[in-house]
Amino acid sequence: MSIPFPSAPADKEALENAGLFSPKFDAHGLVTAVVTDARDGELLMVAHMNAEALSLTLETGIAHYYSRSRDKIWKKGETSGNLQTVKEFRTDCDQDAVWLKVSVAGHDATCHTGRRSCFYRTVELSNGDAVTKITDDTRHFDPATTYSNT
């Protein structure tokens, strides 16, 4: 079953107040999804959701996203066992982005690299170049083993 999301109201006040969830999809039919750990607030990932992913997430309580590179719905953690159970689902004032507070099953890892968060690097300026530096290299699972059959 797919939830019929209404178009965003033209009235800004109606959009910003409580009422029907009416996501404002971009030209590609997507909204940005920010995902944090419900337990400690750590930023885990940023992804995109289309109407189907939003519906599946709301209906099942398990996070689903839209993969732009694979052009399909993706149930986060389906292969690795690190499913994301949604504890709280929020939207911003314009309803063009959502924030999922999740608990992560399995290895408690969100990133396909095996790390807890996709944000495991800092960006710094070094000798005039922007460079990345790994700040969390703890691997919670081995991606080569986990994704060997995908």
UniProtKB/Swiss-Prot annotation:
The lineage's top-level taxon is Bacteria
What InterPro entries does the record tag this protein with?
PRA-CH (IPR026660), PRib_AMP_CycHydrolase_dom (IPR002496), PRib_AMP_CycHydrolase_sf (IPR038019)
- Enzyme Commission number: 3.5.4.19
- What is the free-text note on the cofactor? Binds 1 Mg(2+) ion per subunit. Binds 1 zinc ion per subunit.
The prosthetic group or cofactor this protein requires is: Mg(2+); Zn(2+)
Amino-acid positions noted as binding Mg(2+) in the UniProt annotation, renumbered to this chain: 92, 94, 96
Any GO MF annotation of the entry = magnesium ion binding
Reactions accelerated catalytically: 1-(5-phospho-beta-D-ribosyl)-5'-AMP + H2O = 1-(5-phospho-beta-D-ribosyl)-5-[(5-phospho-beta-D-ribosylamino)methylideneamino]imidazole-4-carboxamide
Its pathway?
Amino-acid biosynthesis; L-histidine biosynthesis; L-histidine from 5-phospho-alpha-D-ribose 1-diphosphate: step 3/9
Q: Which UniProt keywords apply?
A: Amino-acid biosynthesis, Cytoplasm, Histidine biosynthesis, Hydrolase, Magnesium, Metal-binding, Zinc
Positions of Zn(2+) binding: 93, 111, 118
Q: Which Pfam families match?
A: PRA-CH (PF01502)
Q: Where in the cell is it found?
A: Cytoplasm
GO terms, biological process? L-histidine biosynthetic process
Q: What is its main location?
A: cytoplasm
Gene Ontology cellular-component terms for this entry are:
cytoplasm
Q: How does it assemble?
A: Homodimer.
Q: Which HAMAP family match?
A: HisI
Its job:
Catalyzes the hydrolysis of the adenine ring of phosphoribosyl-AMP.
- Which protein family is named in the record? Belongs to the PRA-CH family.
Could you tell me what this protein is called?
Answer: Phosphoribosyl-AMP cyclohydrolase
Q: Which gene encodes it?
A: hisI
